[in-house]
Design a protein with these regions (language model features):
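Phosphate-binding loop of NTP-binding sites
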Residues: 71-74, 83-226, 230-241, 256, ...
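Residue-level signal for inorganic ion chemistry
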Residues: 31, 79, 120, 149, ...
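Nucleotide phosphate-binding/pyrophosphate-handling subdomain across enzymes
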Residues: 3-14, 24-34, 143, 274-379
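N-terminal leader/targeting and accessory segments in enzymes
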Residues: 1-104, 108
Length: 461
């Protein structure tokens, strides 16, 4: 199916687009250009959306439902939902029960994409892994379209793609939930408790992650983390071939680490790929990210290209990103760390105990393990955001906590917390923003949080 034929297949149907986020805007433009009248629903008020934008949308043929009642009275035949809106929301469930098609911009892209697709999901590491896969393919000479949760929306790019290109997608549990997708290669980096403020249960979250491979068919390839009990168990449900990556075991097929060396394994026969210490990005979690990417591109990207990218790629913004060193103090931005496991991985990647700034939006994830790791690996702790008290409790209740060696301050204002952390630092210290929480308490997303941190740090004298 082409993009044109997909858009034409909607002829005669009433359509609503829920959420005016980045991914839905090109979709909306395609629908309007095709002459459809579209209902646009967004939880923002008209004032928050902006009068100019609201008027422009109405002039283009949109009917707007904004604010608190934006989900009321859904009678349309086709519903494009924003990824952050759970499909079991009562209004959506009722619409689906009466026969409405509940879909998304990303599901539409899978339907029309003419090229091969590698899709990546996971609780942690998916953005870096997705980016590494893209870099590997580009370095091998392939044309790559990077999208999903990163890059740009790809639906309107489909006409530019050919069968020899690659689309590399980062997919969240929100996007995957109830979505029909058949990537040629699926990657699940790991699964740990996350987004439990949205998903009704941890089991529901796991089920969403499995959607990335369940419809693949026998020709598909799924790459799984052998060291994560949940993803390891996913293998029995994979309809196609399975490759594992591991720091702990040597899989029959996949990529693994043994005594500092990364190996490929094909039917039990291992060949050396590279020394792990040659990877420019710091930390064992990045070794895992590379192993996942190497497994996904096995047979597509040469070993020489794998080594060249690993030795030169400097990483993605907001992921253990060194911003500057001032008066001997180094400032590191790990705003992407929106879960305890991600912050723990960052702490393990560093070669010294940082002054840590943590806290943010509450996703109802336990902080017990984080408390122990903070006691082991942090010099001083500055807490901010909605979860400050929860993290404080986890740290101070840890049997490893010693108030004499780990000072803790709780500061409501993010800006003030950063300034206080900087003021406490001495030459040789590292100040690390790694919140262990989402950003939605005070920021639109982790990017805005990271850029705010960068701005504050760059203004320091």
């Amino acid at each position: 199916m082409t993009l044109d034929s997909y858009i034409q297949s909607l002829h005669g149907k009433s359509i609503t687009v829920i959420g005016l986020g980045v991914s839905n805007r090109p979709l909306l433009r395609l629908l309007l250009d095709a002459g459809y009248t579209v209902s646009v629903r967004d939880k923002r008020t008209r004032e928050a959306l902006g009068e100019d934008e609201a008027a422009a949308l109405e002039a283009a043929g949109c009917r707007l439902m904004l604010g608190d009642g934006y989900l009321a009275g859904i009678t349309e035949d086709v519903i494009f939902r924003t990824p952050g809106l759970h499909p079991f929301t009562p209004e959506l469930a009722a619409a689906k029960a009466r026969g409405a098609l509940l879909t998304s911009e990303m599901e539409a892209f899978f339907a029309v994409c003419p090229c091969r697709i590698i899709a990546v999901t996971g609780s942690d590491g998916k953005t870096t892994t997705t980016t590494i896969i893209s870099e590997l393919l580009k370095a091998q000479g392939h044309r790559v379209f990077l999208g999903g949760n990163i890059g740009t929306p790809l639906l309107n790019k489909a006409p530019e793609m050919t069968s020899t290109d690659w689309a590399v997608l980062e997919l969240s549990s929100f996007q995957l939930h109830s979505m029909n997708c058949r990537p040629d290669i699926a990657v699940v980096t790991n699964v740990s408790p996350n987004h439990l403020d949205i998903h009704p249960s941890y089991e529901d979250y796991q089920t969403a992650k499995k959607q990335i491979f369940l419809s693949q068919g026998c020709a598909g390839v799924t790459v799984l983390n052998a060291d994560n009990a949940i993803t390891r168990a996913f293998a029995k449900d994979c309809p196609g071939k399975v490759r594992f990556f591991s720091r702990e075991t040597a899989p029959e097929n996949g990529v693994f680490l043994r005594e500092g060396v990364i190996y490929r394994s094909h039917n039990g026969e291992k060949t050396k790929l590279m020394d792990a210490e040659s990877i420019l990005l710091p930390g064992l979690h990045n070794v895992e990210n590379y192993m996942a990417a190497f497994a996904a591109t096995d047979g597509i990207v040469s070993d020489d290209t794998c080594r060249a990218v690993a030795e030169s790629f400097r990483g993605v913004a907001h992921r253990l990103e060194m911003i500057r060193t001032l008066h001997g103090v180094t400032y590191c931005n790990d705003s992407i760390a929106s879960s305890p496991t991600r912050t723990i991985a960052g702490l393990h990647a560093l070669r010294q105990k940082p002054i840590l700034i943590a806290g943010g939006y509450d996703k109802h994830i336990p902080f017990d393990k984080l408390g122990d790791e903070v006691c082991r690996h942090v010099k001083a702790l500055f807490l901010t955001g909605f979860t400050a008290e929860k993290i404080y409790d986890a740290v101070t209740k840890s049997p490893l906590y010693d108030p004499k060696t780990l000072p803790i301050r709780k500061i409501d204002d993010f800006h003030e917390a950063v300034l206080a952390a900087a003021a406490s630092a001495e030459a040789g210290d590292l100040v690390l923003l790694s919140p262990a929480c989402a950003s939605f308490d005070h920021f639109k997303n982790f990017v805005e949080r990271g850029e705010t941190f960068r701005s504050i740090v760059n203004e320091l004298k």
